[in-house]
């Protein structure tokens, strides 16, 4: 799939999230906001920090879209500092830890499209996807997937998640 995307002109950037067991731990709290994530390490090579900064500027000017491949890619991108200029000036890889838990209602700033699995209920990953498209929409998508016999979790089927603005532009 990544080869086909590249053949279609999609540029690939390397980002790394050292995913820990907390990503897969069930949410047991009544309120998603009360769930605590474990810290996970992030690393972005200096050259990719520059490319991400260029993509941020391009998107701000109305051009291009960012496709995150995998839910944890969204967590990684959304954990980055809003401005990457300081990291670029340092000229070194960007390395830090994050405990970001994306939940419905939180803005997703750096991703426009998401290619991901169908995640298990009460997981941090389904909460992340719901932050991307909204709780009502994710419930509808998952109900359709269950009706159609889609496979869930890491080795199951995948979906391309498009924000409402792309499906029904205003």
Where are these regions (language model features)?
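Surface-exposed, charge/polar-rich loops and edge strands
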Residues: 1-170
């Amino acid at each position: 799939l990544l080869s086909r995307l590249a053949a279609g002109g999609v540029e690939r950037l390397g980002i790394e999230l050292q995913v820990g067991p907390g990503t897969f731990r069930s949410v047991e709290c009544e309120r998603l906001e009360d769930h605590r994530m474990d810290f996970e390490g992030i690393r972005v090579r200096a050259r990719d920090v520059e490319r991400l900064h260029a993509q941020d500027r391009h998107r701000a000017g109305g051009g291009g879209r960012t496709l995150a491949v995998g839910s944890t890619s969204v967590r990684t991108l959304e954990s980055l500092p809003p401005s990457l200029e300081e990291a670029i000036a340092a000229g070194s890889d960007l390395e830090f830890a994050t405990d970001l838990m994306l939940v419905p209602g939180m803005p997703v700033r750096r991703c426009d499209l998401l290619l991901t699995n169908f995640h298990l209920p009460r997981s941090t990953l389904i909460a992340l996807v719901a932050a991307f498209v909204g709780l009502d929409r994710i419930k509808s998508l998952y109900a359709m997937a269950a009706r159609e016999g889609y496979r869930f979790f890491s080795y199951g089927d995948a979906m391309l998640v498009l924000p409402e603005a792309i499906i029904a532009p205003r």
